[in-house]
Amino acid sequence: MAERNTAEELDDVYEIKYSTDAMTGGADKRMYLYYQLADSIKKADSVDIIVSFLMESGVKMLLGELDNALKRGAKIRILTGNYLGITQPSALYLIKHKLGEQVDLRFYNEKNRSFHPKSYMFHYKDYSELYIGSSNISRSALTSGIEWNYRFSNKTDPINYEKFYNTFVDLFENHSIVIDDEELKKYSKNWHRPAVSKDLDRYDLQDDKETSNQIPLFEPRGAQIEALCALENTRAEGARRALVQAATGV
C-alpha cells in the first residue's frame, strides 16, 4: 500500500493558481517554489536542473511532473553534487527507477572545489526561463522552508541568462560524471548519513505535518527503495529467485 503522493496533497490544500517571480517560502503557500516549478515543468520542452544535493523527499514531489514531461518528449538533465554525502542514494535510485535512462543524471566531478548552485532552467518553444536562489531538492526547500528564489527569462535579461546557462552547459558537459548503475552502486556503498541530514529530515517532517492532513500509509523509503530497485533489476535480468538481507528496522 503506497502513501498518497506528497505533490497531490499540496495541490489539494492549495488549488488557486498563483504566479510569482519571487518565491520566499514560509507560511504563505503562494510563495512556495514547488507550485511554480510544477507549472513550468508541465509546459517545458526541456528541463535543466543544477543543485548541490538531492533528497528523497523533494524528488518524490517532482517525480510525477517530470515523468509526464518525459512522456510527451521533453529532455531532462540533472547535475547534482556528492559533496559531503548529503545527496541521498535513495533519491538517485528513485530517479533512475521511475524515470529511467531518459534522464541524463550526473555528479559534479571536481573534487577540490565546492559545489553549491541551485538553479532550474526551462526551455519552451519561443523562450527560456531560469529560477535561481537557495533551494535544493528537498520537501522543505520546495515548500515552507525560508528559501529565496527568483525567476527571470532570456527575454527580460538575456545577458545574464546566457551567463548562467552557458556555465551550466560547461559544468554538465566538461566537469561531470554520468551516474550509471555502477557509479550509483559505488556511491551508495560508500555513503554514510551525514550529521546535517538529521536536521534536514526534521525540517521535512515538520513541513509534512504542516502541509498535509492525510493519514500517512506505508511506503518504501531509504534503503528500502534501493532494495526494491535492485530486486526489479534482478527480475529484469531473468532471475526468478532473490534474497534480501537487512538489519532489523531498515
Short names for language-model regions:
Residues 1-221, 225, 229:
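PLD/PLD-like phosphodiesterase catalytic module centered on the HKD motif
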Residues 232:
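Short, locally clustered residues in the helix-turn-helix/winged-helix DNA-binding domain
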Residues 236-250:
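Walker A/P-loop
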Residues 176, 235-236:
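Secondary-structure transition/hinge residues
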